[in-house]
C-alpha cells in the first residue's frame, strides 16, 4: 500500500516575498502568518515579504521565517493524511508542528532562540561550512580527519545525497578544503554563505542553554512518526524527540539514511512543503522511483486542494 511522507526544507530555501501570496488569500495560512507576527519580537512579515532592511539571511530571522512559511502552507492544505514526516535541519521543526509535537507558537519561539544562540555561539569568521561534491561519505570523513587537529576541527555535517556531503568546522580548515578540494578528488568544494559551524561538535557550546530553553514548552507525543536527523528513524515519543532536537545542533543531518528508512517503510510519495525544491532534488539522487510533489505557492495549494 502506498505511503506518504511530508518533508520540510531548512536554511538556504528562504527568499524575499516568501508566503506573501498566501497572506490575505487563504484564511488558514493568514492565521499562521498573523500568529507569527504576534508571537515574535521583530516584524517577521516585513522581513519575509520585502526585507527592506536586508535581515532575512540572518539565521535568527531565517529560521522563524522558514518555519512560518512551511507551517502556513501546511495549514492551507486539505486531506494530507501523511504516514510520516521529515525535515532537513531547521525543517525538522516544521515536522514537529505537523505531527503536533509542538504548537506553532511554541515552535516559532524555539527556532528564534535557536537562531540567536547559533549566531552568538562564535564570532563572525571563526566557523563556516562547505559543500563537497563528487566524493562519498567515507572519503569526505577521511579528509576531515586528516585536516583536523587538537585545536581546529572539520566534520561531515549534512549527508545530503550520493556525491553531496556538507562539511562544517573552523573557517581556516573550510578554506583549506575549498582550496585543496580538487586535488583531493572532489569535483568541487563550494563554501556556503553561513555564519557558523552548524551541525558540528563545535555547536555543543550552546547545548545547555538550548536544552533549558526548550524544556519550558509543552512537548507531546507525535501523531505520526517524525524521522529524525540524528538517528534516521521514525520517533513518536516526546522525550526521545526533544532529546534528539538538542543533539541535532551538533550532529550531522543523516538525510540519505532518513530517506532510505522511509522508503524501506513503504513510502513512495514525498511531498515537499516550503520554498524551493532542494529536498526533492536530493531525493531524486537517492532514489529515482519515488513520486515527488512540491508545494511552494498559493497556486500549488489550490492545485492540491482541488485535485485531492
Curated annotation (Swiss-Prot):
Catalysed transformations (reactions): holo-[ACP] + malonyl-CoA = malonyl-[ACP] + CoA
Gene3D superfamilies per record: Malonyl-CoA ACP transacylase, ACP-binding, Malonyl-Coenzyme A Acyl Carrier Protein, domain 2
Any one Gene Ontology molecular-function term assigned to this protein's record: [acyl-carrier-protein] S-malonyltransferase activity
Enzyme class, spelled out: transferase
UniProt pathway: Lipid metabolism; fatty acid biosynthesis
UniProt keywords, alphabetically: Acyltransferase, Fatty acid biosynthesis, Fatty acid metabolism, Lipid biosynthesis, Lipid metabolism, Transferase
Assigned EC number: 2.3.1.39
Domain of life of the organism encoding this protein: Bacteria
This protein's record includes keyword Glycoprotein: no
Membrane spanning stretches: none
GO terms, biological process: fatty acid biosynthetic process
Pfam family, one: Acyl_transf_1
UniProt-annotated catalytic positions: 89, 199
Keyword field contains Lipid metabolism: yes
Gene Ontology cellular component list: cytosol
Family the entry assigns: Belongs to the FabD family.
The protein's name: Malonyl CoA-acyl carrier protein transacylase
Lineage of origin: Bacteria, Bacillati, Bacillota, Bacilli, Bacillales
Gene: fabD
Amino acid at each position: 500500500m502506498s505511503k506518504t511522507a511530508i518533508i520540510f526544507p531548512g536554511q538556504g530555501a528562504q527568499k524575499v516575498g516568501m508566503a506573501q501570496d498566501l497572506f490575505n488569500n487563504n484564511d488558514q495560512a493568514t492565521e499562521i502568518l498573523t500568529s507569527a507576527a504576534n508571537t515574535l519580537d521583530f516584524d517577521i512579515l516585513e522581513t519575509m515579504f520585502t526585507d527592506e532592511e536586508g535581515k532575512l539571511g540572518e539565521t535568527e530571522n531565517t529560521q522563524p521565517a522558514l518555519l512560518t512559511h512551511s507551517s502556513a502552507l501546511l495549514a492551507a492544505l486539505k486531506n494530507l493524511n501523511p504516514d510520516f514526516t521529515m525535515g532537513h535541519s531547521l525543517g525538522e521543526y516544521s515536522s514537529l508542528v505537523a505531527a503536533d509535537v509542538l504548537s506553532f507558537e511554541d515552535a516559532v519561539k524555539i527556532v528564534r532562540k535557536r537562531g540567536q544562540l547559533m549566531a552568538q555561539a562564535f564570532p563572525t569568521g571563526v566557523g563556516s561550512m562547505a559543500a563537497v561534491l563528487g566524493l562519498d561519505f567515507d572519503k569526505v570523513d577521511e579528509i576531515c580527519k586528516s585536516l583536523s587537529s587538537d585545536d581546529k576541527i572539520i566534520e561531515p555535517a549534512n549527508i545530503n545525497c550520493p556525491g553531496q556531503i556538507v562539511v562544517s568546522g573552523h573557517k581556516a580548515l573550510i578554506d583549506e578544503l575549498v582550496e585543496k578540494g580538487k586535488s583531493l578528488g572532489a569535483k568541487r568544494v563550494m563554501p556556503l554563505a553561513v555564519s557558523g559551524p552548524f551541525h558540528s561538535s563545535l555547536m555543543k557550546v550552546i547545548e545547555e542553554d538550548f536544552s533549558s530553553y526548550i524544556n519550558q514548552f509543552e512537548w507531546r507525543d507525535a501523531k505520526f512518526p517524525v524521522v529524525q536527523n540524528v538517528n534516521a528513524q521514525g520517533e513518536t515519543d516526546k522525550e526521545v524527540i526533544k532529546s534528539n532536537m538538542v543533539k541535532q545542533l551538533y550532529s550531522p543531518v543523516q538525510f540519505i539514511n532518513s530517506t532510505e528508512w522511509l522508503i524501506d517503510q513503504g513510502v513512495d510519495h514525498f511531498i515537499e512543503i516550503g520554498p524551493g525544491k532542494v529536498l526533492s532534488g536530493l531525493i531524486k539522487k537517492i532514489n529515482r522511483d519515488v513520486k515527488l510533489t512540491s508545494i511552494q505557492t498559493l497556486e500549488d495549494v489550490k492545485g492540491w486542494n482541488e485535485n485531492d
